[in-house]
Amino acid sequence: MRQSQLFTKTFKQAPKDEVAKNAELLIRAGFVHKEMAGVYTFLPLGLRVLNKIIGIIREEMNAVGGQEVLLSALQEKSLWEKTDRWDDTKVDIWFKTMLKNGTELGLGSTHEEPMTRLLSQHINSYRDLPVLAYQFQMKFRNETRAKSGIMRVREFIMKDLYSCARSEEEHARFYAGLRAAYIRIFERVGLGEVRSYRLRHL
């Protein structure tokens, strides 16, 4: 699509209530639209960038043996009660809702519990291992303060990966492969020689 055909516009100024520089620049350039604090809509240019980044990550995850899934954003109360992470006094970022029959649900802020249950139902023997399962999924977090632009929001896409191995040694090989994959991702998206403290010291 030609830039002249875009319905979106650029702006000289960002919304007055936007205090984060990252979001201010993206709004002014016509990449995202601010719906409310911590909630942004990706416009055609922003979505194009997002999809390219996801594509690069997907290629690298598949290259190390990852299998992509897509778990439900709606999660059962009973599942999270088993790990004592449903109570708001323990985890205070839930967006909770209820079905018409009274069943309580939450919009997933993470997917450890659902993924653990899923894998436990499909892995019956060491012969089923190893497994690397990953997803790109919308997450929801009821943040008290959402003033960091697109860096800390209430609704966002997260790529998460879960591994099951036959031994600590196999798991260590997974980790080394994934570490190398992320370094390649950083380089491919233009971040260059990114080395966080965690990457340098693990």
Q: Predicted segments — roles?
A:
Residues 1-202:
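TRNA-recognition modules of translation machinery and tRNA-sensing kinases, especially anticodon-binding
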